Amino acid sequence: MSFSRSAADAADTLPDLAATLGTPAEGAFVTLGDAFHTRLPAAPLAAPYVVGFSDEVAQLLDLPPTLAAQPGFAELFTGNPTRDWPANAMPYASVYSGHQFGVWAGQLGDGRALTIGELPGTDGRRYELQLKGGGRTPYSRMGDGRAVLRSSIREFLCSEAMHHLGIPTTRALTVIGSDQPVVREEIETAAVVTRVSESFVRFGHFEHFFSNDRPDLLRQLADHVIDRFHPACRDADDPYLALLEAATLRTADLVAQWQAVGFCHGVMNTDNMSILGVTIDYGPFGFVDAFDANHICNHSDTGGRYAYRMQPRIAHWNCYCLAQALLPLIGLQHGIADDDARAERAVDDAQAVLAKFPERFGPALERAMRAKLGLALEREGDAELANKLLETMHASHADFTLTFRRLAQISKHDASRDAPVRDLFIDREAFDAWANLYRARLSEETRDDAARAVAMNRANPKYVLRNHLAEVAIRRAKEKDFSEVERLAQILRRPFDEQPEHEAYAALPPDWAGSLEVSCSS
């Protein structure tokens, strides 16, 4: 079904939308069976109201841009079954397990997320819609099933910001607020953010069926992912080994992109890793301000397991966990009668795939850093030059985003133009030493300064979702002023553009930003 985007027809959209969400498509995750999920109604929020809405995501889903203004919209996207919600559209929460902070945590699952169905996208793909904060589920454990306004706004803004940075991510259609109180470290108010993704299958889904010794369900899940998202794997000599390779390589590419923009996820547990290699579960994330390779964005991560510099290593480790879960499937088609021999070969094959992670990640990050430095030609010492810059930034706590953005102003021949970026460094002599190396390297390039600057400004964003920017929007939203959420969302749609009217959003963080802390409490 396709929905008209005209204002005249928008009023009729909600009933059709709810009906479409309630009609599972062939091959949808919900059709896998009760072993994979639990169907249950959402717990409606009291007097919900719209905080933010992405007309871009609406367009992707072929929904009218006026949808959020329609009566019943806020109710529908908090899972309220009392309006426009057909009987067959019961939401579901999926079950999975996983490793949290490196320790096996056993069964987890969607503790406050409810998937309400799928919609066809204008790009030919199908997208699941998931309500984060939709209420308690059988997997909530001690939680209340709610999300708070603070974390919901952060996820809404960052999902869309990452998309416009060109980084694979779940999207966000809307965030709905309520005055309903929620107890966290203090009393906050409840909210629901509507996540949008082709799939919400995580590494932890595979770990769950492996740990429960259900190879039949493990295979059913793997077949679902292959048939729907990795059909080329079906033609491989070993489809399940090919699935592991696809997930491993996508994850390596993803984390290289994170590192290149200074993004820290904060909670890289295996249950927060997407089988499609997209960024998922925005919690205590953060973009690095003053560069510190050991930066920890999550206040709860006291050991620094998920620090900026650790992200590639942790992602690789998580792929090992996925490989272990897939071992019962790897090599099945070889027809090896002896179980021990088959298992031994499966381990060898999986290890060979896992060895490709650093082989993929290293060159991917080098390409990204070469683009950030404006180097069109590949030279042997480029990685060393980039690492030396990061070391110099680390020593001076130079701002990550501004440093790379201002590098475009450096001239091949005129050191006096270094001032804008040089001023970001405490140890300016150290910067000068690096800048001389950089200029020498630029002398090998054929592009002139102007052409290089244009290319660099396409690789180095001027605007990222810094914590203090999100905090300002959150504080205003708590006062029912949602204009800053909208303004920030619009700015972050064009992260590489100058936008001189919004220069303040690209400035160094104010002093008070240093006291901001984000944690797993959301």
Curated annotation (Swiss-Prot):
Alphabetized UniProt keyword annotations: ATP-binding, Magnesium, Manganese, Metal-binding, Nucleotide-binding, Nucleotidyltransferase, Transferase
UniProt binding sites for ATP: 109, 111-112, 132, 144-145, 195, 202, 281
Class of this enzyme: transferase
Recorded coiled-coil stretches: none
EC number, as in UniProt: 2.7.7.-, 2.7.7.108
Annotated active site: 271
A molecular function (GO) term: ATP binding
InterPro entries attached to this UniProt entry: SelO (IPR003846)
Name by which UniProt lists this protein: Protein nucleotidyltransferase YdiU
